[in-house]
């Protein structure tokens, strides 16, 4: 059995025997929880594992070939040296592959450190975002408190406005009442003026009547003087006539007729004088009564005029006071209406400002929510990448542990089968001694050794297969546990972030 046939048989069949179907392992590793990078490198890990398994199997085959070398009589030193060189080359390739795997492992560890640093930075940024998200809540509390204060001020202004409206309505009613009273007083004043005019006409009539009576009195006095003068003249004429008649009678009967004529004249004079006195007294009494009546009427008219003038003056004073009061109330009403308009404009401006502030805060809140959602998505992506890298690191760790276990078991089996420490130096004397000592019994011993070596090879391959299957099963179990734990951690982290963000909202 040559080295080339063993190598190619290992590359084709030992991979399926040890690790099973590579597509099944790759599909199992590239599950729904892993990322694209892990799926792209699952084939490389299976290829590396298959290469390492083939290398170990080929080294085992080399050991077995070295075990078979002493039994072959036709093997020369050149072939042994070539196989030794091939073995060295294979070992060198294996070392280079292990070095490359170690370098890749170091790169992945550095990448994990970088991702942990980024994770810490993102956690710090998330804490800052939470703090920033908590600050708008305090701003909202301040805004709500200020809004409550402004609402209280608005309610006070509304109550003051309602009170002012009530006062305005009361003042309007008072103005209406005063206006009605003013109109009533105006009507009373007009009636008093009309009465005054009527009284004035009566006074004028009384004055004219008094003047007429005075003229009548004067005419009566003149007539009385004229009557007295006429009476005196008539008396004088009668006296003269009486004297003439008395003289004529005296001549007839002076002694008898003289006393009777004197007494008759005396009686006539007394009658005329009493009649004139009665007429004069009656005229004076009528004049005095008329004059007293006219004076009384004039006094009453003067008193009524004075009272009317005083009442008119009082009405004018009250009207002026009510007019001044109405003007003051009108000015107060206008000032209150201006204040109400100013308060309404100020309230509208403040409400518009608060609406703008509310809109700005809502836009900031939406921006913060969108930014938080973006950071959550980035954090989710980073968690997915971290989970994939953790799975990949665990897979590489299990692969390295399995390779170390397999190399240790392979080294023990090779050392048990071939106890020589350095086959490159000890192989030629061993081959020479075996070829010189056992030339005669080469055929039978070669068959027996081949059968024994085949049995040992089958046992070693079965043992390696069992160990590799155990390593693969433990790797798959660890991988599934890592995926489940990572999903649980990610789900709990997302739920915690969502709960905290919803509570803060």
UniProtKB/Swiss-Prot annotation:
Coil 2: annotated segments: 263-408
Alphabetic keyword roster: Acetylation, Coiled coil, Developmental protein, Differentiation, Glycoprotein, Intermediate filament, Neurogenesis, Phosphoprotein
Residue ranges of the region described as Linker 1: 130-142
Single GO MF descriptor: protein-containing complex binding
Head as annotated region, ranges: 1-87
Pfam families recorded: Filament, Filament_head
Stretches assigned to the IF rod domain: 94-407
Tissue expression from the record: Expressed in the dorsal root ganglion neurons (at protein level).
PANTHER family xref list: ALPHA-INTERNEXIN (PTHR45652:SF18), GLIAL FIBRILLARY ACIDIC PROTEIN (PTHR45652)
Family in the record: Belongs to the intermediate filament family.
Subunit architecture: Forms homodimers (in vitro). Forms heterodimers with NEFL, NEFM or NEFH (in vitro).
Protein name according to UniProt: Alpha-internexin
Species assigned in the record: Rattus norvegicus (Rat)
Lineage per the UniProt record: Eukaryota, Metazoa, Chordata, Craniata, Vertebrata
Gene name linked to the record: Ina
